[in-house]
């Protein structure tokens, strides 16, 4: 069974910040993952395509907030590592996304770029 992924940090569109700031997502993620996520995501481009559904994701249903529909996501708890330092986090796999199949979004209770000193093209290891 697959137990780790490797990929390189890439820039996103900044949309993760908006979604991660919504109270319903924050509350659901805190209940499921045990932490309130930082308001943003880290995009990582894998060197291959994987089927995230094979990794037993936890599903979060669609919901309405302030008269707008928000689509559900799938979560996979992970450890995000750079060298020997790791942080608890999760892969967030939105039902509706514009990312190619080999780009994943990561969340954590901290700003990963800052606390892991990450820049575009840095290699990260994701422990499943």
From Swiss-Prot:
<dbReference type="InterPro" id="IPR023465">
    <property type="entry name" value="Riboflavin_kinase_dom_sf"/>
</dbReference>
<feature type="binding site">
    <location>
        <position position="97"/>
    </location>
    <ligand>
        <name>FMN</name>
    </ligand>
</feature>
<feature type="binding site">
    <location>
        <begin position="110"/>
        <end position="113"/>
    </location>
    <ligand>
        <name>CDP</name>
    </ligand>
</feature>
<feature type="binding site">
    <location>
        <position position="105"/>
    </location>
    <ligand>
        <name>FMN</name>
    </ligand>
</feature>
<dbReference type="GO" id="GO:0000166">
    <property type="term" value="F:nucleotide binding"/>
</dbReference>
<dbReference type="InterPro" id="IPR053397">
    <property type="entry name" value="Archaeal_Riboflavin_Kinase"/>
</dbReference>
<dbReference type="Pfam" id="PF01982">
    <property type="entry name" value="CTP-dep_RFKase"/>
</dbReference>
<protein>
    <recommendedName>
        <fullName>Riboflavin kinase</fullName>
        <ecNumber>2.7.1.161</ecNumber>
    </recommendedName>
</protein>
<keyword id="KW-0460">Magnesium</keyword>
<dbReference type="GO" id="GO:0000287">
    <property type="term" value="F:magnesium ion binding"/>
</dbReference>
<keyword id="KW-0285">Flavoprotein</keyword>
<dbReference type="GO" id="GO:0009398">
    <property type="term" value="P:FMN biosynthetic process"/>
</dbReference>
<feature type="binding site">
    <location>
        <begin position="12"/>
        <end position="17"/>
    </location>
    <ligand>
        <name>CDP</name>
    </ligand>
</feature>
<dbReference type="GO" id="GO:0009231">
    <property type="term" value="P:riboflavin biosynthetic process"/>
</dbReference>
<comment type="pathway">
    <text>Cofactor biosynthesis; FMN biosynthesis; FMN from riboflavin (CTP route): step 1/1.</text>
</comment>
<keyword id="KW-0418">Kinase</keyword>
<keyword id="KW-0547">Nucleotide-binding</keyword>
<dbReference type="GO" id="GO:0008531">
    <property type="term" value="F:riboflavin kinase activity"/>
</dbReference>
<keyword id="KW-0288">FMN</keyword>
<keyword id="KW-0479">Metal-binding</keyword>
<dbReference type="InterPro" id="IPR023470">
    <property type="entry name" value="Riboflavin_kinase_archaeal"/>
</dbReference>
<dbReference type="InterPro" id="IPR039063">
    <property type="entry name" value="RibK_CTP-dep"/>
</dbReference>
<comment type="function">
    <text>Catalyzes the CTP-dependent phosphorylation of riboflavin (vitamin B2) to form flavin mononucleotide (FMN).</text>
</comment>
<dbReference type="InterPro" id="IPR023602">
    <property type="entry name" value="Riboflavin_kinase_CTP-dep"/>
</dbReference>
<feature type="binding site">
    <location>
        <position position="43"/>
    </location>
    <ligand>
        <name>Mg(2+)</name>
    </ligand>
</feature>
<feature type="binding site">
    <location>
        <position position="41"/>
    </location>
    <ligand>
        <name>Mg(2+)</name>
    </ligand>
</feature>
<keyword id="KW-0808">Transferase</keyword>
<comment type="similarity">
    <text>Belongs to the archaeal riboflavin kinase family.</text>
</comment>
